[in-house]
């Protein structure tokens, strides 16, 4: 796709990945803000795929300004997303339904211990704890992602002793 847009609370995060969307970026940005009623759009056009289109990487506020960390609510869980950092637009929103399904699965089968490999910022770890897991081990090669995963556990009121974060390469 040439355009990816995610909404995190009061902030849009967008990737303009093709020459066509780049050409119309200002118009697209204005229309997105008009359609959503928001005032902030952070551009995360820093993907290597832009080079295939002859475009340089770009990241920063396209419209508005302010802190890049946003707190969102997914199901009953609170999560923080930094639209300036991390993968893609900042978080894997497309996994929202899977995180809910995973919490329900943990609850249904009574899983007590969960290993979350490639955990990124711990969305599935929070889901496992919300589903009733007694302990979750989260593994990722990114230390900053694990810091955020730990903060998500505490942000949702879970005992941090029920969560272990391991900085390691699962491969």
Where are these regions (language model features)?
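Non-catalytic substrate-recognition/targeting regions of SAM-dependent transferases
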Residues: 1-6, 23-92
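Non-transmembrane, interaction-prone segments in cytosolic or luminal domains
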Residues: 10, 48-50, 62-63, 155, ...
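Carbohydrate-binding surface patches
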Residues: 11-16
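Rossmann-like S-adenosyl-L-methionine
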Residues: 66-171
């Amino acid at each position: 796709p040439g355009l990816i847009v995610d909404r995190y609370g009061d902030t849009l995060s967008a990737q303009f990945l093709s020459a066509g969307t780049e050409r119309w970026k200002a118009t697209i940005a204005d229309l997105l803000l008009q359609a959503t009623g928001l005032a902030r759009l952070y551009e995360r056009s820093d993907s290597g795929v832009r080079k295939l289109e002859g475009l340089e990487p770009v990241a920063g506020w396209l419209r508005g300004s302010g802190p890049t960390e946003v707190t969102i609510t997914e199901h009953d869980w609170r999560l923080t997303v930094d639209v300036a950092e991390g993968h893609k637009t900042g978080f894997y929103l497309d996994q929202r339904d899977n995180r809910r399904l995973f919490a329900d699965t943990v609850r249904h089968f009574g899983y007590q211990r969960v290993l979350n490999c490639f955990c990124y910022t711990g969305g599935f770890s929070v889901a496992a704890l919300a589903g009733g897991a007694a302990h979750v081990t989260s593994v990722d090669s990114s230390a900053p992602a694990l810091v955020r995963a730990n903060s998500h556990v505490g942000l949702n009121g879970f005992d941090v002793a029920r969560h272990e974060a391991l900085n390691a390469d699962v491969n």
